Amino acid sequence: MVIRLFENDKQLEVFFSSLDKKKKYLLALSGGSDSLLLMYLLRSRGISFTAVHVDYGWRETSYQEACDLASLCEREQIPFILDRQEVANPMDFSDIENIARQYRYELFYRLCKERLFAGVFLGHHADDQAETILKRVFEGAHLGNLKGMARYGTYKGITLLRPLLHITKRQIVEALDNYRIEYVQDATNADERFLRARMREQLFPYLQEIFGKNIRQPLLFLAEDSAELREYLDQQAAPFLSQVIDNEIGQFLPVGQELLQTAFLTKWVCKQFFFKQGLVASKGFLQTVYDHLVRRSEARLRLRNRTVLVKARGVIIESIY
């Protein structure tokens, strides 16, 4: 029934029409409003899937919630996988959010490989996307890396599917509430000891109150612009990166006068050159490299455990022997 509220959603229509319905998929089912709505969407669109739930045991109610989800899936005739991971006190870990996320994604990876699932459906929505983008802004991410989460993404070769990125949390909750469908309200989502919760409960309301407008949509527009910029930069960088050669010293990126005429593109090409060798270069490091290239002055720099040589006509990453 809920799905009728979204049956005229063109983005969902395009998304689901692109899927191979002969294949089987995996659904990350937390029991929250977003993943539960996604479960009903998949059923209504004729997608064959198995639900997987991870119970970390963080809350006293988590065991019963997992049992309730198992019962729900049994009633709906949806295959269900329950994975229990007992964590005595999540606050004993400084980065528990990322630790838990990494565990889930590794579980998804194993299941997809072992049971040949074509991909994993994730319930990330527009509010999650806005939070991700703002977090990256504050972290100083490159303009080409503010694109947020991808509707079609990958993790170690498995496909990640996020059809709800254009739908807000309010729309999801209203849809479920209107049809009296119960969902788990995870208290940790509002626990301000966690960064995401602080952003959700404090930062976004504060910024919107001061600014006087909803800031989520502009952030989503920023992500779209960033994705287009990233695509453009990659196209422009490709001819230069194709000139990388291996020599007796290491990998050599030629940098001619044509490229140096555009500082932004030069630094992007260098950034991707380093990244392809497993090196993440900071903004300051890239600026230093660019300054030496412009002055045609040689330099010997360290980037993590590698030596970078800036020459008059290019950049070399020394090989490790």
Curated annotation (Swiss-Prot):
Record's keyword annotation contains Metal-binding: no
Primary residence: cytoplasm
Signal peptide interval: none
Lineage: superkingdom: Bacteria
Keyword Hydrolase attributed: no
Entry's free-text remark on domains: The N-terminal region contains the highly conserved SGGXDS motif, predicted to be a P-loop motif involved in ATP binding.
Function: Ligates lysine onto the cytidine present at position 34 of the AUA codon-specific tRNA(Ile) that contains the anticodon CAU, in an ATP-dependent manner. Cytidine is converted to lysidine, thus changing the amino acid specificity of the tRNA from methionine to isoleucine.
Name of the protein described by the UniProt record: tRNA(Ile)-lysidine synthase
Originating organism: Chlamydia muridarum (strain MoPn / Nigg)
Lineage, highest ranks first: Bacteria, Pseudomonadati, Chlamydiota, Chlamydiia, Chlamydiales
Gene encoding the protein: tilS
